[in-house]
Structure formats: C-alpha cells, structure tokens
UniProtKB/Swiss-Prot annotation:
Primary enzyme class: transferase
Name of the coding gene: yhcY
Its EC number(s): 2.7.13.3
UniProt modified residues of type Phosphohistidine: H191
SUPFAM superfamilies from the UniProt entry: ATPase domain of HSP90 chaperone/DNA topoisomerase II/histidine kinase, GAF domain-like
Protein name (Swiss-Prot/TrEMBL): Sensor histidine kinase YhcY
Organism: Bacillus subtilis (strain 168)
Length: 379
C-alpha cells in the first residue's frame, strides 16, 4: 500500500473517531476542522451550515486570516459568495476548486487587513444521502488548485461530517422531544394537584372568614387567603414556563401575555425583523420570562420595558426596569442562580449576555445574538 494511501486512511480514521465521539454539532465541527487542517497541512478552513431557504450559519472556522476574522467575522457571516450561490442553485454536488474567494476579494478591497496569502479555496458539500447540510471550505496561502487526490480525500471527510451531523441532529431532536414531554407531564401534574389544592385553600379561607367575628382571627384568615392567592399566581407562572407552548402568536405577544399573567405592564418596542430559529426564539423567551419574574419579585415596580433590535447579523434584546436595582460589580460574579441560569442559556445559544444595575437606579439585562445570514445579502 502506498504511503499516500496510508496517510489518507489515517486521516479518515482520525476524523471518524472524533465524529463518532461528538454530541454537540458546533464543538465537534470545530475540533474536526482543526484536525483536518493539521493532517492535510492546509492553513485555514470554515464550515457553513445552510438551511433550505438559503440562509446560512458560520458553524465552525479555524485559523482564519485577519481579513476574515475582523469585526467578529462579519465578512463570513453576511451576504452571498460564489460557493453558496452554486450550492443553493444545486450546481455543487461534489468537491470543487473555486477560482477565487469573493469574501477574500471583499477583504482585499478594504486595503487594511492581511489575507495571509489566501486567494482561493476548495469547497465540498456536506451531505448524507439526499440530505444536504452545508459546505466545507479549506484553503492555504498561494494554493490555487487542489488535485484530484486531495479533492477525493475532502469528499470522503465531508461525507463523514454529513453523516455525523445527521446523527447528532436526530439525537438532539429525540432529547428535546423527551424533555418537552417531561415538562408537559410535570406541568399537567402541577395543574391537576398543587394548583387545585391552592385554589381549595383560598376558597376555604374565604368561607372561613364568614364564620367568625373575631378580628384577629379574620386578619389571620385574610393572610392565609392572600398567601394562597400569591402562591396560586406563582404556580400559574411556573406551569406557563414548563409548558412548551406560548410562542404560537410570536415572541412579542408571548412577552405581553406573560407580563399580564404575572401582573406586569410590558412596554415592548421592536426595530427590524430578526429571522430567528426555533431554538433562538425559545432561548429569548425563557430568558425574558425569568427576567420578568425577577422584576415582579424584587424590583418594586409594575412596569418593565422590553426592546428587540435586529440588524443583518445580530439581534439585541434589552429588558429594563426602573425599580430598586441592586449592587452589582461584574468582577464579583453574578448575584443569583436565576441570573446565572439566564447567562448560561444565552451563551449556550451563542449569544453574549450582560447585566447592569445599581441600587435605586433599576436593572438592565441585555442579550446580543448572532443571526443566520439571509440569502441575497451583499458581501
């Protein structure tokens, strides 16, 4: 067996082992891409995951030149390019040499960032049977052509990646489905048991008050009734959060409805129209719910301001109240498990999370979420 063939088999074996161990798509693609570049002595690479409508996400990248990594990789996250256009038109079915890279061309026109000698790249579709997931692009300084053997190796790796993406997506779907079923079950049990018991306590207290003229006893009964009413409201909010529904009429309506449920007036504003995936919308929804709960419990105000601003590449969500606020210093860490949970949820979705607050000035919570690039935008 030739040395070249042995090296190819070794590369495929290493890639396959990494993919077989992967459970998170982004983390696995990041690791595999770096391994591929190391094993093939290529310089730079990136992977686009592409939806049926042509929108795409920069799912992984490794060792991008400064020209492409500037400003949070903006040139990689927006607009069309030759390889994406060809993929979306159905003209890219196997590994191919791309004559030049439109994104590099755009970077060179800026005349201020280094492309590290990269002008061309090979592009390979990521597929599994009839399912098409995206593109694998690899490049090296001064390399304008990839020979047939190199392209065959890239095709083999791309097929492995496509198969792994399909497996991980299926596993992710099954896990989410199981989680939603469990949340629904818990919500139903809480509604049928604890919720009904709290309602009974409230009614019993109301009836008991009519049976006595003792003012002290009446005050105690009033306290029990008010406490049970508060607990009932908390339980309704918890059930709402557990159930997977709530977004049927959109994020804005869900936020307003939830505010009304817990007794908060919501001033909602929106600029732009972000294209959110189901996962991104669900993440924003859960973070807003937790933030509004905190506002209701701790801020001492009956109004919260929620704004959603969208640009081509990002969506920014701000939740503001002018209530009590709290002493917060970023270097000291987050002050509560609820806020830590919001931060973890946001960062898991690839978003940035930060909070501003001071005693007597209220609280502002912000999330900045990268969006999928839309088909047809300019590079």
């Amino acid at each position: 067996m030739s040395k070249t063939r042995m090296e190819k088999l070794k590369t495929l074996k290493t890639i396959a082992e990494t993919l077989n161990q992967g459970h998170d798509i982004k983390a696995t693609l990041d690791e595999v891409l770096k391994e591929l570049l190391s094993l093939t002595n290529l310089q730079s690479g990136w992977i686009f995951l592409i939806e049926e409508d042509g929108s795409y996400t920069l799912a992984a990248d490794a060792y991008l030149p400064p020209a492409l990594s500037r400003k949070e990789k903006v040139l990689m996250c927006e607009g069309e390019c030759y390889c994406l256009t060809k993929f979306n038109n159905g003209g890219l079915r196997k590994a191919a040499n791309i004559m030049n890279c439109k994104r590099i061309e755009s970077a060179e026109n800026l005349h201020c960032f280094d492309t590290e000698g990269i002008t061309h790249h090979a592009t390979v579709p990521l597929e599994d049977g009839d399912r098409r997931f995206g593109l694998l692009n690899v490049a090296a300084a001064g390399k304008t052509m990839f020979d047939e053997e190199e392209l065959h190796l890239l095709e083999s790796v791309a097929f492995q990646i496509g198969t792994a993406i399909q497996r991980m997506r299926l596993s992710e779907y099954q896990q989410k489905n199981a989680l939603l079923m469990e949340r629904n079950r818990l919500a139903q049990e809480l509604h049928d048991s604890v919720n009904q018991m709290l309602f009974s306590v409230s009614l019993t207290a109301k009836a008991a008050k009519t049976l006595t003229k003792d003012e002290n006893l009446q005050q105690m009964i009033d306290f029990i009734q008010n406490l049970s009413q508060d607990a009932l409201a908390e339980m309704k909010a918890l059930i709402w959060q557990l159930r997977p529904g709530g977004l049927e009429k959109g994020l804005a309506e869900a936020i307003k409805s939830y505010g009304a449920l817990i007794g908060l007036k919501i001033i909602f504003t929106q600029k732009g129209c972000p294209v959110l995936t189901d996962e991104q919308e669900h993440m924003l929804w859960r973070v807003v719910q937790e933030a509004l709960n905190n506002c209701k419990k701790h801020a001492g105000t009956d109004t919260a301001y929620v704004s959603l601003t969208a640009s081509l590449c990002h969506a920014e969500l701000d939740i503001i109240d002018h209530g009590a606020g709290f002493r917060y210093e970023a270097h000291a860490g987050l002050p509560s498990l609820g806020i830590k949970g919001m931060k973890e949820r946001a960062e898991k979705a690839g978003a940035k999370f930060w909070i501003e607050s001071a005693l007597g000035t209220g609280t502002k919570l912000s999330i900045r979420l990268p969006l999928k690039s839309r088909k047809g935008g300019a590079v």
